[in-house]
């Protein structure tokens, strides 16, 4: 079971590396990593389990955040219409996105960042992603609103980008310039 002790914190170089694609079909090890990450996110949202194990609540977790430099992440979050997105994804790729941007009015947080970082994080309002789910099935999803923001936050982790790198005008010792390929 993944706990907060397994979460890599900001300042660790693995969070700044571009993660490696995983081999397909998924190995049993990669499938298990996705299942374990998804279990952590679900547990973090259960008040009893979270209190018992000292888990901070989250809606997504990327493999680099547990020290694994692979293109894997898990999400367990509900969109504005009540649709649940609960899955692990391997080799996610954005195949299209809007020019229009969106942000969470209260900013973003991160399980790897143990402090509040004020500021708006501009994200694409809509995007289409492809990848392979934790059961090995090809997926293609059109996302918008809150759930699109969650996916982009996790995708950034796979590219070595922290959410605060996107906050304009932020003076922060951990902030890095965005790479040229950033969405």
From Swiss-Prot:
One of its GO terms (molecular function) is peptide deformylase activity. It comes from the Bacteria. Binds 1 Fe(2+) ion. Transmembrane segments: none annotated. GO terms for biological process: co-translational protein modification; translation. Fe cation binds at residues 110, 153, 157. It catalyses: N-terminal N-formyl-L-methionyl-[peptide] + H2O = N-terminal L-methionyl-[peptide] + formate. It holds the Pfam family Pep_deformylase. Its cofactor is Fe(2+). The active site is at residue 154. Its EC number is 3.5.1.88. Keywords: Hydrolase, Iron, Metal-binding, Protein biosynthesis. SUPFAM superfamilies: Peptide deformylase (SSF56420). Removes the formyl group from the N-terminal Met of newly synthesized proteins. Requires at least a dipeptide for an efficient rate of reaction. N-terminal L-methionine is a prerequisite for activity but the enzyme has broad specificity at other positions. HAMAP family: Pep_deformylase. Belongs to the polypeptide deformylase family. This is Peptide deformylase. It comes from Shouchella clausii (strain KSM-K16) (Alkalihalobacillus clausii). The gene is def.
């Amino acid at each position: 079971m993944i706990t907060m002790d397994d979460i890599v914190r900001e300042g660790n170089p693995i969070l700044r590396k571009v993660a490696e694609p995983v081999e397909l079909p998924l190995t049993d090890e990669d499938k298990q990593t996705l299942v374990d990450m998804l279990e952590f996110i679900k547990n973090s949202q259960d008040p009893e389990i979270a209190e018992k194990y000292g888990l901070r609540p989250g809606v997504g977790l990327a493999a680099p955040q547990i020290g694994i430099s692979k293109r894997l992440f898990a999400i367990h979050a509900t969109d504005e219409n009540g649709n649940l997105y609960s899955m692990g994804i391997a080799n996610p790729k954005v195949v299209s996105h809007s020019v229009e941007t969106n942000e969470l009015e209260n900013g973003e947080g991160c399980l790897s960042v143990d402090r509040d970082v004020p500021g708006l994080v501009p994200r694409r309002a809509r995007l289409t992603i492809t990848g392979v789910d934790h059961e090995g099935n090809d997926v293609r999803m059109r996302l918008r609103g809150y759930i699109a923001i969650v996916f982009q936050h996790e995708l950034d982790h796979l590219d070595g980008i922290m959410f605060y790198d996107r906050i304009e005008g932020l003076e922060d010792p951990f902030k890095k310039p965005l790479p040229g390929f950033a969405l």
